[in-house]
Amino acid sequence: MSGDEDARLPVAAAGDADPTLAEILRRYFDGEISAPVTLMQLLIEMEDADAVAGAVRAMVRDMERAAAGSVAHRRARELEQLMKANSAGCERIAMMLRADVDSAKPARSVEEGIAFCERLFDWSVQQSEEASVALYSLGSPELLQRATDEIVVQLRRWGLVTANTDLLDIGCGIGRLLVALAPRVRHATGIDVSAEMVKAAQRRCAGLDNVTVIKGDGYGLTGLADASFDAAIAVDSFPYLRQSGYALVERYVADAARVLRSRGELVILNYSYSEDADTEAKELRALAEQSGFDVVEVGGRPFRLWDGVVFRLRRR
């Protein structure tokens, strides 16, 4: 039996119960998403860590009977072992999902959207600092650090992290990237709308003389000086801006252009959580044109652990 045929076994079994679960598993066995992202997506769909663990165990048993020793069987076992190793974190994430504090519904106004983000992240960070900024971390500091390291490596490959770089992290969350980047840049500034996130970031960055963390008002980059940064990054923050209204996205991109120096880059990692890549690309190109950016990259997926999508804009 070929590897592709092996992988069809758990996908078909899941499809009998739920086509969405089948699609998640298909993407995993086809190598499109990592094991942590797969478990995150299963948790989002099922909102029950025990149910996810049971489904994964059943899948492994089926694979042992039909395709023991195959590549697909080993991949299934990897998923099972990851679930076991992070059972407490997965249960915490399932609890967070069941609490129904988050919502994918577009806000009725920018004001409502900003208030929603403040409430959501003030609450989330108190449940799990790691999961509050990356559900795919499964609440694990180690997994989150691996994902963070991947981002830092990519920023360095793009030439955006040097000893002379003044960097801005838009939606800095708990400050994980500020901590990782501080030894590699001249100065790093983080801004976030959530007071509780800012507290966590300030605590994690305590003792780092070249890091500043500030609470923003959510309406833009108010208070940051013109032409004061060489690079700005936004990791999983633009989806919430977009959910709050396109006008807010326009404001942030225009503000990024204002605070960046000439040839400085705005790196957006995930612009939205939509599956509509064409719409994302069209919007980003329009935003770039109206705010004085050139488009460097649209839609890249360079990460192994995380399924983040890259959008890079360079200030003219």
Where are these regions (language model features)?
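Class I S-adenosyl-L-methionine
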Residues: 293-316
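A short glycine-rich, Lys/Arg-flanked "PGG" loop and its adjoining helix->strand segment in the class I
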Residues: 249-262
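Conserved alpha-helix/loop element of class I SAM-dependent methyltransferases that forms part
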Residues: 145-163
